[in-house]
UniProtKB/Swiss-Prot annotation:
Its EC number is 2.3.2.3. This is Phosphatidylglycerol lysyltransferase. Belongs to the LPG synthase family. Disulfide bonds: none annotated. Catalyzes the transfer of a lysyl group from L-lysyl-tRNA(Lys) to membrane-bound phosphatidylglycerol (PG), which produces lysylphosphatidylglycerol (LPG), a major component of the bacterial membrane with a positive net charge. LPG synthesis contributes to bacterial virulence as it is involved in the resistance mechanism against cationic antimicrobial peptides (CAMP) produces by the host's immune system (defensins, cathelicidins) and by the competing microorganisms (bacteriocins). Residues 1-8, 74-89, 150-161, 222-229, 293-337, 391-394, 437-450, 511-840 are cytoplasmic. The chain crosses the membrane at residues 9-29, 53-73, 90-110, 129-149, 162-182, 201-221, 230-250, 272-292, 338-358, 370-390, 395-415, 416-436, 451-471, 490-510. It comes from the Bacteria.
Amino acid sequence: MNQEVKNKIFSILKITFATALFIFVVITLYRELSGINFKDTLVEFSKINRMSLVLLFIGGGASLVILSMYDVILSRALKMDISLGKVLRVSYIINALNAIVGFGGFIGAGVRAMVYKNYTHDKKKLVHFISLILISMLTGLSLLSLLIVFHVFDASLILNKITWVRWVLYAVSLFLPLFIIYSMVRPPDKNNRYVGLYCTLVSCVEWLAAAVVLYFCGVIVDVHVSFMSFIAIFIIAALSGLVSFIPGGFGAFDLVVLLGFKTLGVPEEKVLLMLLLYRFAYYFVPVIIALILSSFEFGTSAKKYIEGSKYFIPAKDVTSFLMSYQKDIIAKIPSLSLAILVFFTSMIFFVNNLTIVYDALYDGNHLTYYLLLAIHTSACLLLLLNVVGIYKQSRRAIIYAMISIILIIVATLFTYASYILITWLVIIFALLIVAFRRARRLKRPIRMRNLVAMLLFSIFILYINHIFIAGTFYALDVYTIEMHTSVLKYYFWITILIIAIIVGAIAWLFDYQFSKVRISSNIEECEEIIDQYGGNYLSHLIYSGDKQFFTNEDKNAFLMYRYKASSLVVLGDPIGDENAFDELLEAFYNYAEYLGYDVIFYQVTDQHMPLYHNFGNQFFKLGEEAIIDLTQFSTSGKKRRGFRATLNKFDELNISFEIIEPPFSTEFINELQHVSDLWLDNRQEMHFSVGQFNETYLSKAPIGVMRNENNEVIAFCSLMPTYFNDAISVDLIRWLPELDLPLMDGLYLHMLLWSKEQGYTKFNMGMATLSNVGQLHYSYLRERLAGRVFEHFNGLYRFQGLRRYKSKYNPNWEPRFLVYRKDNSLWESLSKVMRVIRHK
């Protein structure tokens, strides 16, 4: 049997043992808890002195400082260039994390390796020392186990009750001398031969400190058991939790404590309350402190240090691949820590709704409690809804959270007035102020599906909140009073109203205030860029007057865009120096992210697809644009006799065509206005992707007109210079609708012939929407659906007719795309684009 097979068998046996032990613990614990009267547990909790609770929590938080001695020993042994204060802070964070999700200490060992490898040259020695620390966590327990074996601590009752623990106790006791001998004979560093012994002493003191915390919990709930028996039960319970490999020993530790004190005649309700207090004081409080420390300890400075560290090694395998993300992970720790703290705060104060409702049951002024309960619940829900926004460092989310904290403080002061909780709220508020100053964006984009999800989530949370309160009152036999007083009857709707007012007011203020922040370069800069680098088929639309411009720092590339519904809709590809497009888009996306806007590109070519892809976008084919090769275009030949017939017909009717250069007279503009108004027939003009009938816009390029024999304008088209590839296009094409003449054909034919005469080589006839979209079985579902619209809804919009019309000019078809973020909805993005096009 080779080593690989042995390792696999060992892993399977280990997993099987842990799973079987976990199932056994859960079943046994459930059986023990099923007989507990939770009402008595709550009554016992209400008797606890609040100052004793404060001292307990302080003691629980302070007890974890002892574990920091591991890291002090480690830093001194390896001569790390790191201050004692930083060691203590980082160590506290690591140990608090390890206590919750330790998996036998392996999580803590991994985090230590990640943090301290930047402070030492000898990585191999670091790993050896960390392994020694990991093992020494058991040696301290081994030393205490020896004291039970030699009857210093009396555990006879529990050993008789749980016989299998005796063998674990003996095995662990034998581990200590073996470890001491091995660590002294083969130390990780010959100059530090007694490190193993030092770590064992630290481990022993730490386990005793944890036992003292549990003992203090017992004293608070009035459990009368000798200190020696307390320690004995704790040691055996800790061994059970360690062997189970369950994070924090949850379940196994608690079961042994429950059974141990039950053998001593302690009521189960008191033991349960003692365990809950212990878990909160020794696990939850240190985690809270660690999260607060993380908000200050990690962040920009840590990220910069690691990025500049000569010890930072590129990823080469799975482990190093994960480690390569450490600078990003560490940079996010402060916001993640604060988000977790806000989440816990929300949950804690949701539970405190019970206190408000309970007080309201015995108070005649129910109206006041309606309002206070609704405010309190609204604030808790707002905290919960903005957890993700806080993690994403959104200032708007942080403001929502700060307002929520203030509302909770007000509700707390007017109801149960817990100064411990108010102190906690003040701490969270201070952390939110720090986070607000560090925030990297004003707000996150508002998306319809997110709003719907938040609404459904809010209803669900409020429903669960009501069920929780009602269920608790049923358990306490006071629900009958609640039904008579109707404290819970209407506050759901009041809560929704308060949330709507707060959310609506802040959202409106942000949109109003920061709409002024949107920057726009002047049109002269854009003209200079086009003059130097050329434009594209859409660049002439800079003169339409309905767009803003974003220019890069070097002023050699720009985008034209328009704001609509928390989105920046960009028209076409970037314009200018192609080498600057990457920098331009990065600056634009940073700008949009800061303001909390989505970015949508409309009608882009396939030339820059890789560039858009780099920014996390996906694509939807809008259709194809007809580009006519003027070098091949002609009205001669059999296939073109229709073109000649059209031109001949206009000649017979004495209808002429000419190009008028700006500036234009008022009389000429009035003639065009008359034709345009009749053509529009009270329909609204489109915007953004096309020009509008506007004298300023029209005066920027020549206009082609067709006149009748009376020299009256009957049709016109505005030219669109492209400033690249010897190409030209037309924008507005309008004619008198009452004339039964092929005026559109006439304008196009005359423009094609004129453009060819002027030396242009390409003519853009515009896009055929949804043309050639989703034609293959392998296409995306959304594109296949769009293709069916093209085929079967021609009555609503002339999709096929437009393609057929342009096809007779034998164009080359070039695809055009919608570009939008991969986490955005296609239909929502299309809707925003259409709103931009159809509204001024």
